[in-house]
Every structure is written in C-alpha cells, then in structure tokens.
Regions:
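Glycine-rich ThDP/TPP pyrophosphate-binding loop and its adjacent helix/strand module
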Residues: 55-61, 65-67, 103-281, 441-458
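Thiamine diphosphate
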Residues: 1-146, 268-269, 281-458
C-alpha cells in the first residue's frame, strides 16, 4: 500500500540522511572520494529511487525497468548507497569502496549489474541517457530514463550537443536533473546559483525546465510528476543544492571537493551532525517494500536471419563506403536490433541506404560526433546493435567517448569513411591518419580495414 504524502516525505528525508551517512562513512574508510558531492544530491537520490523509479533491485536488467545514469560519476558512493538501501546488496559492502578487489570503484562501471555505462568522464552520461531513451522507443516500452548531472559538468560541450539532440528528437521519456551546488573542484561553477540563467539555457535548447529547491523533498516529487506529464520534449530539473549539505563545517565551502573526512574527530563530528537529522516517521514506513517493480516479461531472443552474400559481378566497381551502406541495410533486414546513427554525412557514408528501409531505426545526430557515440553506448547497453558512422577523421572528436565505450564494454560498431589519405584533394583536415592508433589503443577493440567492396560486406 502506498504511503500518503505526509508519511512519505519524512520517510524519504530519513533515507536521504542514511545515504549521506553511508557516503561519508564509505569514503572515509577508503581514504578518498567525494562525500560533499554526494551530500548535495542525497535528497534527489532518495526521492528518485524510493518514490519515482520503477525497478527491481534483484533484476536490474528488466527490459521495462526505468533507467538511471549517474553522469556526475564522482558521486558514485551515493549511487552504491541507494542500491544498498534498496536491498541490492548488503550495506556492509559499502565499506569496501575503492578497494582493489571490490566492484565498488571510485566511479561506476558496468562491472555492477545496475550500471548501464561507465561514467566519471564528465559530460557523457546525458549522451548515453539519450541512447537509453531512444531504445525505449525501439522496443515500444514505456520505461523512462533519468540522468543526474553536476552543474560544473554542464560546462562540457557534449552536454549541449545532447541538449540539442534530445529536444529535436522530442524525448519526453527523458528526465535530467542538474545538482546545482554551485561549487566545482577548484572554484565556484560558471553560473553559481543563478537558477534562472541556467533554466533559460535549457529552455532555449527546447527542454521543459523546472527550478526547485533540491533539498525540499516535496518539491522534488512534484517536479518528477510534472516531468512525467510533459509531452513532446525532455525535462530538465534544476535543483538548487548545497555542497556538503547536512554537515555544518563543510556546507557550501570551497576546498572540500574530493576530500574524504579524516577518521577521528573530523569524521565523528560529521557523523554526529548527520545522526541528529533523522525525523519522526510513521511506523512501518518501509520504502524498500514500496518500490514499484515493472512487470516481468520474457526477454526477447532474437533469431537473426542469414545475411545475403555480396552479389557483385566480375569487373564491377564499388567504393568501400557504398558497400558499407549496402551491407548495413542487409544487416538491418537480418536483425531488428541493428540501428544506425549518423552525423550529417549519410549520403557520403551511404548509411542512408539503411535509413530508406528502416527509418524508425535510423538516428540523425547532425554534426555532433560526441553525442552520436554516447547515444550509441546507451543503445548498446540496452540491447541494440548500433552502427554510428561518419568520416573516419571526425571519429577522433569523440575519442574520450570511445575510450569510455571500451571501459563500458558495450558492443558498438563504428564505421569511418574516407580513410587515410584517400581524400587527398580535400586537404589534411579531412584525412584520417590518427584514428587507427586511437582505436588500437582501446582494449578488446577489433579494427578492420577492408580493401574492397566484398571485404567490406563480409
């Protein structure tokens, strides 16, 4: 039975306090981490996990479960604390944070079953969240995707590539939250607590923007409800928060980013202050038992069809990039999981051959290679087989995303056309010379360099 609001809010406040305590305690045990960045997000995380998300702690891969991406990956301790609070694993395991033999790394990776993509390189989580939201459309699921960003992170250009893309695609199943605590690593963030300036930017990019007090649990719940009711565009909740919230001697103070509390007097003082913040809650207010679980439906088992072999005649001339387009369309016919992503060069890479046959599985990202690779990561993490393609030299713009895709161990198939000096007359800006080294430097990457149309298709 659902709790009424008068019972729910104090229960969520107590969850937020426990999340702060667990984050502080685990980082102090590790001797490193970002406890103040966790404390600013605690009320958001409590409301999100225990009053908004539909998920099953024991089945995080449920295809219809809502997805959460922690784009501000340095706040990993509070992500782990939330999953422990939900019953995914024993709370005592949190004290193994950052140990060499623990999966609870300093920034989250898919070594954990409840993490879809690795984050920590800022500005990437929102791009992956777009891929997750697109995948919900692909499989005709009503799951929603939530992504938590930091305000310092929001200076990254890839965040605004994502903002553009999500708005153009009308992703009303995507909800972002910016933890606006106004402090970065070394100084105040770009816009501080100027909430209307931040909101104006998101609105200008076509998002529904909501400004709230990020420590007012009731306001957080209302914002999530408003996001669910918003149709035709994504929502960004801008939550005004205080870094280090709940611990008086670090609240809103610069110089505490990435610093664990020292064991002894400093840690004891922080924990003592947090322990005093529990509020009376109705008996039986067990939020874990109230988590809304999606219905369990059998995971679809794809049975790909046989792909037709190349059908060129002796003497036919075909560019490798055109053969790529032919092969991509064949793969799309053989396997419904195959999707294609483009950076406004589909008529050069010939991925438009796929678009003509499967427009609903073709995603145009325009000239924004970072969000193209990030969205491919999110799609792959949810079961799609994405083929992002552009000129090979322009894939180097997304090098950090490719690096994180390798860490995430997601199966994306990148195609770069106009390789090497084959486009010599266009000059060096169009030549792909460094990309092979970039790809070969990544673990478990296979690099294929076809010599003709037949080898391209095969």
């Amino acid at each position: 039975m659902a709790l009424d609001r008068s019972a729910l809010i104090p229960a969520l406040k107590n969850v937020a306090t426990r999340l702060r305590i667990d984050s502080v305690r685990s980082t102090s045990e590790a001797g490193s981490g970002h406890p103040t960045s966790c404390c600013s997000a605690a009320d958001i995380m409590a409301a999100l996990f225990f009053a908004e998300l539909r998920f099953d702690p024991q089945d995080p891969h449920n295809v219809d479960a809502d997805r959460f991406v922690l784009s501000k990956g340095h706040a990993a301790p509070i992500l782990y604390a939330a999953w422990a609070e939900a019953g995914a694993f024993d709370r005592a395991e949190l004290l193994n944070l950052r140990k060499i033999d623990s999966d609870l790394e300093g920034h989250p990776t898919p070594r954990l079953p409840f993490v879809d993509v690795a984050t920590g390189s800022l500005g990437q989580g929102i791009c992956a969240a777009i891929g997750s939201a697109l995948n919900a459309r692909r499989i005709r699921s009503d799951y929603r995707t939530y992504v938590l960003l930091g305000d310092g992170e929001s200076a990254e250009g890839s965040v605004w590539e994502a903002a553009d893309t999500a708005a153009v695609d009308g992703l009303d199943n995507l909800c972002g939250i910016v933890d606006v605590n106004a402090l970065g690593q070394s100084r105040a963030t770009m816009w501080g607590h100027d909430m209307e300036a931040l909101a104006a930017r998101w609105r200008a990019f076509g998002w529904h923007a909501i400004v709230i007090d990020g420590h007012d649990v009731g306001a957080i719940l209302d914002a999530f409800g408003e996001a669910r009711r918003t149709v035709g565009r994504p929502t960004m909740i801008l939550a005004r928060t205080i870094k280090g919230k709940g611990i008086s001697f670090v609240e809103g103070k610069d110089g505490w980013h990435g610093k664990a509390f020292k064991k002894g007097e400093e840690l004891d003082r922080a924990l003592a202050e947090l322990e005093k913040q529990f509020v009376p809650a109705p008996a039986g207010a067990n939020l874990t038992s109230l988590i809304t679980k999606p219905a369990a439906r059998p995971r679809a088992v794809e049975s790909p069809k046989t792909v037709a072999p190349p059908a060129y005649k002796l003497g036919d001339e075909i560019a490798t990039r055109e053969a790529y387009g032919v092969a991509l369309a064949k793969l799309g016919e053989a396997d419904s999981r195959v999707v294609a992503l483009d950076a406004d060069v589909k008529n050069s890479t010939f991925s438009d051959k796929f678009e003509k046959v499967f427009p609903e599985r073709f995603y145009e990202n325009y000239i924004a290679e970072q969000v193209m690779i990030g969205a491919a990561m999110g799609l792959a993490a949810r079961g799609a087989i994405p083929f992002p393609s552009t000129f090979a030299c322009f894939l180097t713009r997304a090098f950090d995303f490719i690096r994180m895709a390798a860490i995430s161990n997601v199966g994306i198939k990148m195609a770069g056309s106009h390789a090497g000096i084959s486009i010599g007359e266009d000059g060096p800006s169009q030549m792909a010379l460094e990309d092979l080294a970039m790809f070969r430097a990544q673990p478990d990457f296979a690099v294929l360099y076809p010599s003709d149309g037949v080898s391209t298709e095969r």
